[in-house]
Structure formats: C-alpha cells, structure tokens
C-alpha cells in the first residue's frame, strides 16, 4: 500500500549498525593479543586492509550533496541513491555525525527519506557522475515489475503538469519533504512530498489533522483540546450522496475557504506536481467519506472548477494512502461523470494528464464504452456514445483507436466491435471498482448566487 511504501524504515539502520558492530567486534577479536596476531599473518593483513579502507571512507565524510552511493533500503538490499541534503545528527563536530536525505534513483520521489550513515555503503561512493549516463543506467536496471510495484498506487494527478524549466525549479524548491508524517483520524500516514505549509509548521516531524475540519496542529495535546471543541462530524457543505457507509459531500471553496486551503495543503503531501491553489473560491470539492457511529471519515476527494470553458469535470483527484487499492479512485472518476450527466454536459479531466493519470482514465473509458458496445446490437456513433456517457468525443475516439476498434471508411470513423475482441479488452481493463448508485445522488448543478 502507498502508506507502507512511503514509510521510513529505521530497522534498516539498526540492522546495518548491528552488522557494523559485529564486524568491528570480529576485527577486535582478531587483533586482541600480540600472540594471536603473530600466529595469524592473515589477520594482520585483514586489519591493515580494513584500516586503509576506513581511512579512505573517512576522507569522503561528510558526504557532499550530489554524491551517489548505495544505501540499504527496507528490503535489506542495497539500492543506488543520490544525496539531496544533509544535516548534523548531534552537536558533535565529527564528520560521521550526519544524516543524509537521499533519493532512491530507481524509485519515485515519494520514497525519498533521511537515512543514517550506517545505512550507506561508503565503498560505493561516487562523487563525479554524469547524471544523464547514471540515470539512463539506473532506468535500464529497473525491471518492469519494480516500476509497476512502486508506481501502481500513484495515479492521482495535480491541477496541472509543469514544463521542463518549471519542473526543475519545482523539484529544487520541493526537494526535501518538510513534513515526515501526519495523523489523520485513526491513521498515522507517512507523507510523500513537500507541501508549502506556513513557515511555522515546516520541519515538524509530524502534524496532527482534525479529520473533520482539517485544521492542523504541531502537537497531539493541541489536537485533543481541539477535538473537544470541534462540532463537526463530517466535512462542511452538503451531503449529496449516501449509499451504505459511503457519503459524498460537496464543499464550496468560497463558503469554506479555510477547509479548502487545508485540503490543498493535505493533498500536496501526496501529489508531486500539483499546483497549490490558494484561491479556492473558484473550486468545488467533492469529499468522499466512510461513515460510522463516530462520524464521516475522509478517504479521498476530487475538485472541479465552478466554470470551465474547456468542459473540465475534474481538476484534482486523490485517494489517501490508507484507502488506496479499494476502488475509491475509480469511484471518484465515475462520480465526476455522473455529475456531468446531471449537468447535461460532456466532461473531461483537466489536461495534460500524467502517464499514470491517463492509464487510470483510459481504464474507466474502456470499461464504460465497451460495456455499451457489447449490449448495443445496431450501429452507434461516437456522438451517441458521448451523449450516453458524458465522455468527451475526443476521449472516446482516442480510447477506441488505442484498442484498434476504429477504422476510417469513406471519409468517416467507423467502430468495428467483434464480441470476442471486446471481451478480451474488457478483461485487460480490469474491474470497475465501486459502483455509483445514481438513485442515491441528490444534487443540482452549481449556479452562482446573485
């Protein structure tokens, strides 16, 4: 799960430290007495070699920012990392008393973390590496399974992607996570990315969120005092959907500005290239909750602009890590299209989509469109499909083309849908997740008052 993948692994450092201590103990035992040393020339040679290696390692300390080295990860295997930042771990002046913020070059940035010196294999230190060559080599070493395992839970998208120059500037500014963990309801969650909280909250090891109003605090005692005063048991706004234990609330950013801003702060901890909007007045937030006798607990949300000239029906989407891989992301996408149907409009997610965002949407479009084509015996046009599904015609065309279900005949696109081919594509698209019970949706489209 995402939260587990994003967690730090202090046991790695402990294990490495224990191994180092055992190694030191063995070397000490080997050189404990003159007689033993004299009777074992190999022991003397090993000690001299070890001493020379230690001197060589010491010359690298403290490691410079940009250094490449192998680091022991939570799988107890060594992985290539790049040192992004460093900090002193004690008041000692020893060059060994540093911690290092590292990026695992095989993995997504969300796994970046602070590690102790014991986790690093100093024999592998590289200080002068051509980044393009190194990154290409790392990419080649990574298997398709590794990439999928790390990235499959991260299909959320931000309000907009960034061009190359903006991306470099963004990564430099956000290179070190400022908040390591949050507590939200009954979950402690490891964060994935930097979020621009007010300066007084930066570098807090942990922030405590009220799961209902999303106010955040530095200390557990503050949260406990707050919870005694907070009257909310669900997100502010109107409950527009209730089916079993699932509820959806529509929150107007203009009416609930602080909640909207706090939601953006929270979301940015788990979305890399999300543009943080302080002007939340322009957005509606649809917050999905699991409900019990204690209240309605947020599991994820999507936002949409109140007025979009491009027919965008979704700007940002997030499922919180503890609730991922349960079908909630697919539910949120489906819900956005049900709102478009109620509006009598076609919709599409805000562009451009990330690769994984496109993969998630392409799966939804495939399932919806092919289910209709399976049941529809006569000819059907792309416009008719769009009217039935609220999916934009361009998205329908690109999806069917990617499945080789479109042919161009006599100046027009023709859908060619063999039942066996449809079944094969549907199987590849996977399950649709939780279904939206449209009969439980009570909602009228947003209209500006006055």
Swiss-Prot record:
A zinc finger (C2HC MYST-type) spans 207-232. GO terms for molecular function: chromatin binding; histone acetyltransferase activity; transcription coregulator activity; zinc ion binding. Acetyl-CoA binds at residues 317-319, 324-330, 354. It is an enzyme of class 2 (transferase). Gene3D superfamilies: 2.30.30.140, 3.40.630.30, N-acetyl transferase-like (3.30.60.60), Winged helix-like DNA-binding domain superfamily/Winged helix DNA-binding domain (1.10.10.10). The modification N6-acetyllysine is found at residue 274. One of its GO terms (biological process) is regulation of transcription by RNA polymerase II. Its main location: nucleus. It is found in: Nucleus. Residues 174-445 form the MYST-type HAT domain. It holds the Pfam family MOZ_SAS. Residues 63-122 form the Tudor-knot domain. The active site is at residue 350. GO terms for cellular component: chromatin; NuA4 histone acetyltransferase complex; nucleus. The keyword Iron does not apply. Its EC number is 2.3.1.48. It catalyses: L-lysyl-[protein] + acetyl-CoA = N(6)-acetyl-L-lysyl-[protein] + CoA + H(+). Keywords: Acetylation, Activator, Acyltransferase, Chromatin regulator, Metal-binding, Nucleus, Transcription, Transcription regulation, Transferase, Zinc, Zinc-finger. Autoacetylation at Lys-274 is required for proper function. Histone acetyltransferase which may be involved in transcriptional activation. Belongs to the MYST (SAS/MOZ) family. This is Putative MYST-like histone acetyltransferase 1.
């Amino acid at each position: 799960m995402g939260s587990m993948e994003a967690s730090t692994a202090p046991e790695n450092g402990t294990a490495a430290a224990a191994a180092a201590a055992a190694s030191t103990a063995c070397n000490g035992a080997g050189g404990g007495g003159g007689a033993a040393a004299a009777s074992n020339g190999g022991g003397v040679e090993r000690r001299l070699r070890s001493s020379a290696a230690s001197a060589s390692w010491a010359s690298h300390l403290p490691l410079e920012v940009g250094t490449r080295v192998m680091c022991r990860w939570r799988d107890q295997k060594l992985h290539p990392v790049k040192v992004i930042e460093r900090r002193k771990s004690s008041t000692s002046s020893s060059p060994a008393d540093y911690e290092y913020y590292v990026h695992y070059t095989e993995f997504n940035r969300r796994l970046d973390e602070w590690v102790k010196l014991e986790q690093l294999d100093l024999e592998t230190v590289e200080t002068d590496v051509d980044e393009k060559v190194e990154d290409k080599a790392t990419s080649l070493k990574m298997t398709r399974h590794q990439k999928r395992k790390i990235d499959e839970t991260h299909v959320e998208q931000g309000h907009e992607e960034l061009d190359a120059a903006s991306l470099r500037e963004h990564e430099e500014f956000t290179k070190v996570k400022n908040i390591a963990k949050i507590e939200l309801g009954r979950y402690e969650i490891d964060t994935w990315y930097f979020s621009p909280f007010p300066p007084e909250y930066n570098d807090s090891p942990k922030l405590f969120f009220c799961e209902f109003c999303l106010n955040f605090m530095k200390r557990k005692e503050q949260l406990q005092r707050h919870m005694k005063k907070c009257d909310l048991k669900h997100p502010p706004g109107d409950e527009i959907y209730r089916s079993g234990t699932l509820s959806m609330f529509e929150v107007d950013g203009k009416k609930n500005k602080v909640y909207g801003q706090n939601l953006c702060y929270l979301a940015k901890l788990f979305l890399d290239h999300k543009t943080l909007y302080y002007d939340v007045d322009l957005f509606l937030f649809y917050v999905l909750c699991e409900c019990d006798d204690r209240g309605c607990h947020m599991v994820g949300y999507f936002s949409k602009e109140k007025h979009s000239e491009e027919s965008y029906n979704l700007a940002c989407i997030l499922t919180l890590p503890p609730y991922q891989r349960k079908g909630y992301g697919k539910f949120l996408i489906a819900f956005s299209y049900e709102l478009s149907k109620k509006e009598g409009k076609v919709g599409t997610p805000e562009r451009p989509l990330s690769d994984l965002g496109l993969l998630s949407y392409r799966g939804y479009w495939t399932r919806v469109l092919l289910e209709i084509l399976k049941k529809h015996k006569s000819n059907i046009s792309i416009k008719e499909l769009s009217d039935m599904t609220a999916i934009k015609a361009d998205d329908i065309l690109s999806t069917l083309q990617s499945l080789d279900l479109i042919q161009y005949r006599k100046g027009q696109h023709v859908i060619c849908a063999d039942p066996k081919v449809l079944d094969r594509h549907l199987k590849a698209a996977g399950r649709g997740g939780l279904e939206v019970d449209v009969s439980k949706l009570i909602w009228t489209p947003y209209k500006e008052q006055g």
